[in-house]
Design a protein with these regions (language model features):
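Charge-dense, helix-prone N-terminal extensions
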Residues: 2-146
Length: 146
């Protein structure tokens, strides 16, 4: 799960580390519309719609570059520290979209295998182009994360 990885990395940096990625009041649509690469901007709008529909939640900015849906209180298994975090989310990066899903990769290995062309990093799915992805399977993985 992405969040567990993120929290562990934050805790390794400092015993008293403060989680910097928090919900903000910035406009999600304005953020997406500022993306210079047209294909990445269009793909971001598609993911935005998919995640809003699946979660029933309005998108919120988390930090300066992550779009999250929903809110959950998580407790670190190592430190016991509790923080607020989104249920699912994504971030348009320079070269790809990072999807933050709370899907158990082992449990959904068959679906993930059929998802299409992507890479994983720290529990994220990094996708260069949505046209290389099976959107029906992606929808199922998004729903499984909720």
């Amino acid at each position: 799960m992405y969040f567990t990885y993120y929290l562990k990395m934050t805790e390794k940096k400092s015993k008293l580390a403060v989680l910097k990625t928090k919900e903000t009041a910035e406009s999600v649509v304005d953020f997406i519309n500022k993306i210079s690469k047209e294909e990445l901007r269009k793909d971001s709008h598609i993911i935005l719609e998919m995640m809003e529909k699946a979660s029933g939640e309005k998108a919120k900015m988390w930090g300066s570059s992550i779009i999250g849906f929903g809110n959950k209180r998580y407790k670190s298994p190592t430190s016991g520290r509790e923080v607020d975090w989104f249920l699912i989310g994504f971030s348009p990066r320079k070269a790809y979209l990072s999807l933050y899903l709370m899907t158990d990769h082992k449990e959904y290995a068959t679906q993930i295998e059929k998802l299409g062309k992507f890479k994983t990093s720290g529990g994220c799915f990094n996708i260069k182009k949505l046209q290389d992805i099976n959107l029906a399977i992606l929808k199922d993985l998004i729903e499984a994360s909720l």
